[in-house]
């Protein structure tokens, strides 16, 4: 069994578990906002555009913070950076729980987003540093399964707590969970400093320019922007559409996340293994093309039986999540190791800003008439266009072959 410099053996499985827990809390913090929209509108007496600001505040703050962090994130031990960033995210979540008004909630979302967005980017950088290329698809599948677990457990439990007690309670519970995850990071995650030796001692702006001057890095960021826009044209408005147009009640909304989460929990790991065997670009292309069918169906769905709505929304979630796993594996492999932390921080910013732009653009397109959403089908078509662009850009991603195991990380 290998050891770190401190003499402490670290198992790859334990590390992936901690990274998945970090990702779970960050994802849940973002996901729980959308189905709580009706409650926020009633409690704060706000309109949909004001609710949209609650959502976009997180994304915009995360994007800006990620750009700033990209200037210096590669100069620090990954573990130390993770502990500091995650502590900030925990405080931001606690501030959300304590928010007494609409304005303070928006401010708290800015804090949570600023730290949470960079944290998620750092998780991907750690995976790229410690997981060999041959197993990276599987590792991405495990960590990205946090989306499914958040859907299966986090969102339904959060909605139950909000419905039975108060909308503040889910954030108090999440902040408490973050404390335990922080202890896990301190216990399990090793000191990762190998990348520092490869970072040239240069001004931060010059280092950032060095990352962005690489055409392959710019194409990779464009690829991720189109991929995120593909999903976030639709996701923020899915729950509202299901209630207003398809006929689900607010109490039935958790079933969308439960059914979709259970299936994606299984499918993402299978797709990760498939990508390792069959090739990540090939699997990405297949999953992206497959996802276009349920996108067009779900955005044009009329009033149907609950089981039909849940079946279609579940297929939509499985296909949508399935394209993320090979995409992230391709992305981490396309960046040189000494640039990976900074690049993934920039990438996290691109993801957040892209999600905000996509949600804003869809909000401009979508209308309301007679209590129903209109023009959601146009949004579905826009999602397909972004998807085709992502397939085209994926052809230009390079593979560095980087990602050998770090000393002290052993596969379980």
Predicted region positions:
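Conserved MFS/SLC helix-loop-helix module at the cytosolic interface between two early adjacent transmembrane helices
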Residues: 64-103
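Cytoplasmic helix-loop-helix junction between adjacent transmembrane helices
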Residues: 108-149
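Extracytoplasmic gate region of multi-pass secondary transporters
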Residues: 34, 217-258
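A membrane-interface helix-boundary motif in multi-pass transporters
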Residues: 163-175, 364-385
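Helix-breaking motifs and short loop linkers at transmembrane-helix boundaries and internal kinks
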Residues: 45, 77, 98-104, 247, ...
